[in-house]
């Protein structure tokens, strides 16, 4: 008798991870358009009408913080608290939730509670944080939808710090939960935990990664590749934190501040641990790392494999971390789990640390190799010495750095919720001035459109400028966008993708229009450059549609304000610099990525669906918005007219495409007589090659598709122009 099989999946009773052969296994180089459709509203049990800011407004935040403070010392038998206080555990949970953020692509971080899902919930560096979340469950149950998991995780870290005597900088709610794993985040190409295939032969870490090994949030605490060398660990620590957007001072403050509390756990070899949560047996109900050693908890806990605490009072804010670091010499040893660590030599009795669970037992302070890099690294050591000598400076630096760490990916201050939001504005928040003048209305908008279209700027130039401003937006950390008008400043006005010469000319023209309007306007009305850039692009779209026989009005929402150069962190904004923009048919030379992959990544950051990506690219091509005026993918003889020509001509079966080089980055399309008709990039031809994208293109290329194309383009255009308008949501 044959094995029984599931009629839907074809699985037999013995299910393995590879039991089903999907399309990606058959065709591994196929682009993954599923990235554009993850987190569908149907996956959200709260529905797409749930208003989290409104729910949070009804939260009794002070009552929740009081309950969290009580939880800190409410030790549970199933997972006893170290020294009767869960503070260290909750700080680690919050830290590791936020610490996955990386500035290169804005992904990771605490913004959506992704620590609840694979792969993060099963990373080796997150061992036993599943217990921390289970400890929070009674409070999540009590307060329900008024607090998201994402907010609760970070708030618990804040309350943990405060309950042990530290004064935090503040807290903002506003993080919304996701309900499935994030598929768009590249965590590395390794296939084994704690392995490293992410460094070049010169030792440089691949972009956009920040952690040094698969399954780590930061660095290997035992040292680079497990070698206990504090000097060699220093560059790893500095680079990893810098890739999160942290300065040297913030790096030292975070390491020292975080390790002021709690302890490491390595009572026995990690081989005593069973599978992580995602691999745990069904009856373990999502709890991973079942510990077979003795009681499996308390004094027998195994987490990182390192064993011990850093300072004599692990549940109190003080200078103990630096005092231990600079008072003692350190001896290399191994923990009971076999992990490299350092133990203080000749410890004074008053510096012996009481055991977290066994009365009468004490041990010497420990440091990890990464900790000692603060003492031995020539760049971090002076900062650590200064903090050792100035407790107030250390406390202030840690408070600010902790707030930055836990709020970096929350987005602009307009998204901050709650009574604990600090008033002080930080430059890393990409501040935009508050609206301080009456807005232009329909009459003024109409008049401005006429003036903008009469300037002599081409449709393509106006569209490209607006697109360049708005398309910097990243949904991952909600940075970028047109608001603030920062395309006027460095670094954006020098990026190759923005055609600096054309951009300079367009901006000068728009500034003239702005100055004239603001000087002549009555009633105090003014228009910002940020608004004018978007309005000019939208007016150009209307004119292009009219030229094709379609009368449309592109919705425009005024209210953007202009930031100043002083409000713009040049180095931080340079992280938004695209490596490719398929919508403008530009890609950095020498990039080892396929143009179509970069296009999908950019579309995902813009929150676009596959149809929206398709109609935007096709429309931008015919509008003439390509970088540098290049003709790749401009499959029309009517440049500047909003039409479905790109779609129609891409599907023309009389055209034969062939690559221009072995690299297969550029293509020539020839007609039946062999004459060159078109040129294209990979970002163009993927819309005819990929079956899903081709199906979408067919809809727009149909005889009845022209009006739909224009309508859908306008809708997608407005969506991108308003991605950062959190001030009106």
Curated annotation (Swiss-Prot):
Swiss-Prot/TrEMBL catalytic activity: H2O2 + AH2 = A + 2 H2O; 2 H2O2 = O2 + 2 H2O
GO biological process, one term: hydrogen peroxide catabolic process
Annotated protein name in UniProt: Catalase-peroxidase
UniProt EC number: 1.11.1.21
Principal EC category: oxidoreductase
Pfam families: peroxidase
The protein's assembly and partners: Homodimer or homotetramer.
Disulfide-bond pairs as recorded: none
PTM: Formation of the three residue Trp-Tyr-Met cross-link is important for the catalase, but not the peroxidase activity of the enzyme.
Listed Gene3D superfamilies: 1.10.520.10, Peroxidase, domain 2 (1.10.420.10)
InterPro entries: Catalase_peroxidase, Haem_peroxidase, Haem_peroxidase_sf, Peroxidases_AS, Peroxidases_heam-ligand_BS
Keyword hit for Nuclease: no
UniProt keyword terms in alphabetical order: Heme, Hydrogen peroxide, Iron, Metal-binding, Oxidoreductase, Peroxidase
UniProt: heme b binding residues: 259
Active site: 96
Annotated site residues (Transition state stabilizer) in this chain: 92
Record's function text: Bifunctional enzyme with both catalase and broad-spectrum peroxidase activity.
Annotated NCBIfam families: cat_per_HPI, PRK15061.1
Cofactor: heme b
GO cellular component: cytosol
Top-rank lineage group of the source organism: Bacteria
Family: Belongs to the peroxidase family. Peroxidase/catalase subfamily.
